């Protein structure tokens, strides 16, 4: 029996999950980028007067909606380009080609520059992590996702302790085997003496 509140359709069947998902209307409100992010990006635009940019509520809403529509429109064409090349995901080249396709080829330069800046910043963070000697417990470079950072020296020390522990365990096992064989030898000698 379906959950309470579900109604039968015209054929008398209860709706399936895919049917329900098709009935949901997705509005632009569901897709909007965070307002604070959009406003901060708008404030980063250099101004000739040097004064701080004030953006009122209506302007920030217009920027938020406009940015969302533009990015979704661009992604639609980037996906089509990727699909025409039998790719499952969009790459940077697909997005740049989509900019040409929608008539915004003048944006290719700034987009490429920002991408290069971002990639350089990521590489710089990786180098800083390597230079600081902080690695995850599993030996990978920490990119800020895990809270447990362990210095490289501690990881090496931990590995050495594990190796020493393994060696000690091997020695203990071999000494136990020796004792067993010696006790078996003594028992066989005693039995031989008793028989004679």
From Swiss-Prot:
Disulfide bonds: none annotated. The modification Phosphoserine is found at residue 183. Signal peptide: none annotated. Residues 144-159, 174-188 have a biased composition (Basic and acidic residues). One of its GO terms (biological process) is chromatin remodeling. Residues 125-196 are annotated as: Disordered. It comes from the Eukaryota. InterPro entries: DNA_Pol-Epsilon_Subunit, Histone-fold. Keywords: DNA replication, Nucleus, Phosphoprotein, Transcription, Transcription regulation. Residues 133-143, 160-173 have a biased composition (Acidic residues). GO terms for molecular function: chromatin DNA binding; nucleosomal DNA binding; protein heterodimerization activity. GO terms for cellular component: CHRAC; epsilon DNA polymerase complex; nuclear replication fork; nucleus. SUPFAM superfamilies: Histone-fold. It is found in: Nucleus. The keyword Magnesium does not apply. DNA polymerase epsilon is a heterotetramer consisting of POL2, DPB2, DPB3 and DPB4. Component of the ISW2 complex, which at least consists of ISW2, ITC1, DLS1 and DPB4. In eukaryotes there are five DNA polymerases: alpha, beta, gamma, delta, and epsilon which are responsible for different reactions of DNA synthesis. As accessory component of the DNA polymerase epsilon (DNA polymerase II) participates in chromosomal DNA replication. It is required during synthesis of the leading and lagging DNA strands at the replication fork and binds at/or near replication origins and moves along DNA with the replication fork. It has 3'-5' proofreading exonuclease activity that correct errors arising during DNA replication. It is also involved in DNA synthesis during DNA repair. This is DNA polymerase epsilon subunit D. It comes from Saccharomyces cerevisiae (strain ATCC 204508 / S288c) (Baker's yeast). The gene is DPB4.
């Amino acid at each position: 029996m379906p959950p309470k509140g579900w109604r039968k359709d015209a054929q008398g069947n209860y709706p399936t999950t895919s049917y329900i998902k098709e009935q949901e209307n997705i509005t632009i409100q569901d897709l909007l980028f965070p307002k604070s992010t959009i406003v901060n990006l708008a404030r980063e635009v250099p101004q000739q007067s040097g004064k701080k940019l004030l953006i009122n509520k209506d302007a920030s809403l217009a920027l938020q909606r406009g940015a969302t529509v533009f990015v979704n429109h661009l992604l639609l064409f980037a996906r089509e380009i990727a699909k025409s090349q039998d790719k499952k995901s969009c790459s940077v080249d697909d997005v740049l080609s989509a900019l040409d396709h929608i008539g915004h080829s003048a944006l290719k330069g700034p987009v490429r520059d920002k991408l290069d800046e971002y990639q350089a910043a990521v590489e710089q963070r990786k180098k800083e992590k390597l230079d600081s000697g902080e690695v995850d417990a599993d030996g990978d470079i920490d990119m800020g996702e895990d809270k447990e950072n362990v210095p490289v020296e501690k990881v090496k020390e931990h590995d050495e302790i594990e190796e020493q522990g393994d060696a000690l365990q091997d020695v203990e096992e071999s000494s136990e085997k020796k004792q067993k064989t010696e006790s078996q030898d003594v028992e066989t000698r005693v039995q031989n003496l008793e028989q004679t």
